[in-house]
Amino acid sequence: MSDSEEDDVANLLDLSATDEYRVVTFYLKPEDKKENFSITQKNETKNLEKEISYYLAKEHILYNTNRVLYIYNEKEWTVEKDFRRVLKTLQKKIQDSLTRKNKKYELLIGVGKSVKGYHGLKDSFKDSKVALEYIDLIREVMGDRSKAIVDCAKLGFFQIFININDKEELRQYIPDSVIKLDEQDKKKNSELISTLECYLNNKQSIRKTSELMNIHTRTVSYRLSKIVDLTDIDFDNIPEILAVRNGIVILKILEQL
């Protein structure tokens, strides 16, 4: 879209060149991937647009093929938490309604970065789409399989890495220890990385790791011992553990590329 076309749209929607905006993308993810861009999905998305208008300003809601966009003006919400609360309420109620009607869709919401003026909206829209594209990976990394609202502004370093599409460049950020464990897993199907990740995500608790992975505590201890033997990892070294955690995330990003 050219600058003049953006100006026309901005005049139509009464958008400012100085206000702070975010693009919020609402997407109905079909249980069956073949249903993406289907007529059924498009019809459900049109219904979604109507539902959203009960919660958010109708004049800033746009239907876009198989998505609904909302242009969020930060000055219209004096407390950002109020907007987040509305999004959570909206998502839950609409999802509950879909479930009751046996509609095989999941309502996902991606929140783009804050931009100044309407000319930056395309960048915010791009960010909101990225949040949705990587929703499964984000859920896994954050340990929350039910997470349905993703804010790009809160992804931190994760967003930096998902913007790198060169696999070899990404590999440079993976510590040797993680690479060794990945190679071992591929050879022996040993589940060392998944065990290590679960262990680190649960305050290095063997018991909790055992419960979540549904394996015996002795199995967890054995795998951790194997991890130390292979990598000489120091679980008390905070910078090293941070690098390992980041490396595991990057490994998952690589699997998505």
Which residues are covered by each model-predicted region?
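Cytosolic nucleotide-utilizing catalytic cores of signal-transduction proteins
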Residues: 1-257
